């Protein structure tokens, strides 16, 4: 039962970390990266679909993304979705290809993105601590009900804290790396 609780804590924390890493990967850094377009949804075919399901997206150079649209009827809808995304990209169209130019980031933009990164990172840390607290509360209830001993509770608490520390280190490392990337001119 204790091992299941530890595994549950680890799985939940790793899932939180995974969501965090994908969230910060979407933060624009001034370089062309396809992941910046992951959240763009296009209204076409009578519904809403992700941009990467109706086109292929690639990095042309350091400042340019290329979108090869599979159906030329979708170009207008894709242009509208890109404009509505407020990413600030300039773009040009050639037949079934859209070229997006990533604008230079100002120092203020970089500072604001670092603040956003800090907020996202802190939210993730809070989530991980809440998972730890939830598991520890469950273990304390088990100890109160005499399902586990006080020693088992202490050992489990130490092991869960180690899992928490490992995940927190990964969060801090990802934060530092992304912050460096954002502040690099």
Swiss-Prot record:
Family stated for the protein in its record:
Belongs to the RRF family.
List the keywords (alphabetical): Cytoplasm, Protein biosynthesis
User: Which BP terms in the Gene Ontology apply to this protein?
Assistant: translational termination
> Could you tell me one molecular function GO term of this UniProt entry?
ribosomal large subunit binding
Cellular component terms, GO, for this chain's entry?
Answer: cytoplasm
Q: What functional role does this protein have?
A: Responsible for the release of ribosomes from messenger RNA at the termination of protein biosynthesis. May increase the efficiency of translation by recycling ribosomes from one round of translation to another.
What name appears for this protein in its UniProt entry? Ribosome-recycling factor
Cystine pairs annotated here are: none
Q: Which SUPFAM superfamilies match?
A: Ribosome recycling factor, RRF
Q: Which gene encodes it?
A: frr
Q: Which Gene3D superfamilies match?
A: 3.30.1360.40, Ribosome-recycling factor
Compartments where located: Cytoplasm
């Amino acid at each position: 039962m204790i091992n299941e609780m530890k595994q549950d804590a680890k799985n939940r924390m790793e899932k939180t970390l995974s969501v965090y890493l994908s969230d910060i990967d979407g933060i624009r850094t001034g370089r062309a990266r396809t992941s910046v377009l992951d959240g763009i949804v296009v209204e076409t075919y009578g519904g809403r679909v992700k941009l990467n399901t109706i086109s292929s997206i690639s990095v042309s150079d350091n400042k340019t993304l290329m979108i090869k649209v599979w159906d030329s009827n979708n170009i207008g809808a894709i242009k509208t979705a890109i404009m509505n995304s407020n990413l600030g990209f300039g773009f040009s169209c050639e037949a079934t290809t859209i070229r997006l130019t990533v604008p230079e980031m100002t120092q203020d933009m970089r500072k604001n993105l670092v603040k956003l990164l800090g907020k996202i990172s802190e939210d993730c840390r809070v989530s991980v601590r809440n998972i730890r607290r939830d598991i520890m509360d469950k273990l304390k209830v088990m100890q109160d009900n005499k399902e586990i001993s006080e020693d088992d509770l202490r050992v489990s608490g130490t092991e869960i804290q180690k899992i928490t520390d490992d995940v927190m280190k990964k969060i801090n490392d990802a934060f530092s790396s992304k912050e460096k990337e954002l502040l690099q001119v």
